[in-house]
């Protein structure tokens, strides 16, 4: 049987823990055929590990999209988009491609960085991506920006933000709480317009978790492409990334990536799902 084809529109992380590299590793683990339209290249200073983001020329970006659309993706995922023009184009491409699913990972900062890459991108995401997305996967910071509610510090805050984001047009909202809400458990909140669900796993090591957000969104996309419902895909992706985080490893003195192969090679983590 032919593999489902999945396109990631994302940046390249030269350290290969996040970005399109994380997406392709995840796609391979979950039996979908991954394609890439590159938006930018992220490099790191070898002394400080500060990030430098170099955008891809728009003409080259368009040629990548033409190639990918001609192949015919079943699902599309976005990661670091970088500019408002690329954000708008990503939304248009989903419609043009005829893909069944559109997963938006609303990347706003690089791991370890504090400043939003481009403040104007938030409004562009709200206008061009959220109304078309099947699933949106913000972390607490990104959910606070997309909802306009600012800092989120509790499950109740997450519920309010999820409702606001849902009202902007995305039928499935999953907010990643991660380590911010509790030291012993990892809590995410999923909302489908009808019911809120809390997804819980044990809290694993957090020193080596580079690429966790990209991996979660990529896994969600792969599971959707292979036939799971949005709720099933999100729960399965939570289990996949939990295994990857638990088995993260030290790359150098600055960073350590998650282990994208841990779910298939080492262990599968149980996810507790409760209505809240």
UniProtKB/Swiss-Prot annotation:
This is Putative pyridoxine kinase. It is an enzyme of class 2 (transferase). Mg(2+) binds at residue 142. Its EC number is 2.7.1.35. It comes from Staphylococcus epidermidis (strain ATCC 35984 / DSM 28319 / BCRC 17069 / CCUG 31568 / BM 3577 / RP62A). Phosphorylates B6 vitamers; functions in a salvage pathway. Uses pyridoxal, pyridoxine, and pyridoxamine as substrates. Pfam families: Phos_pyr_kin. GO terms for molecular function: ATP binding; hydroxymethylpyrimidine kinase activity; metal ion binding; phosphomethylpyrimidine kinase activity; pyridoxal kinase activity. It comes from the Bacteria. Keywords: ATP-binding, Kinase, Magnesium, Metal-binding, Nucleotide-binding, Transferase. The keyword Magnesium applies. ATP binds at residues 139, 176-180, 188, 213, 238. Disulfide bonds: none annotated.
């Amino acid at each position: 049987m032919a593999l489902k084809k999945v396109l990631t529109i994302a940046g390249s992380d030269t350290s290969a823990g996040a970005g399109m590299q994380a997406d392709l590793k995840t796609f391979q683990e979950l039996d979908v055929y991954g394609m890439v339209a590159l938006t930018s290249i992220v490099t790191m200073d070898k002394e400080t590990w500060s990030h430098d983001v170099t955008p891809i020329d728009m003409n080259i970006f368009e040629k990548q999209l033409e190639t990918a659309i001609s192949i015919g993706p079943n699902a599309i995922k976005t990661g670091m988009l970088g500019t408002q023009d690329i954000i708008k184009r990503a939304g248009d491409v989903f419609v043009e491609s005829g893909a069944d699913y559109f997963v938006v990972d609303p990347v706003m900062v690089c791991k370890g960085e504090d400043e939003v890459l481009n403040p104007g991108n938030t409004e562009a995401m709200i206008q061009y991506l959220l109304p078309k997305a099947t699933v949106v996967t913000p972390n607490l910071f990104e959910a606070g920006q997309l909802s306009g509610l600012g800092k989120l510090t509790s499950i109740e805050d997450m519920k309010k933000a999820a409702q606001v984001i849902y009202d902007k047009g995305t039928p499935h909202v999953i907010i990643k709480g991660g380590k911010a809400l509790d030291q012993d458990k990892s809590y995410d909140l999923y909302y489908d317009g009808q019911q809120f669900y809390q997804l819980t796993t044990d809290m694993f090591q957090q020193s080596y978790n580079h690429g966790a957000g990209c991996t979660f969104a990529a896994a969600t996309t792969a599971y959707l492409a292979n036939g799971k419902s949005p709720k099933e895909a999100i729960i399965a992706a939570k289990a996949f990334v939990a295994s990857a985080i638990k088995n993260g490893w030290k790359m150098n003195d600055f960073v350590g990536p998650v282990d994208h192969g841990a779910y298939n090679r080492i262990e599968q983590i149980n996810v507790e799902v409760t209505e809240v």
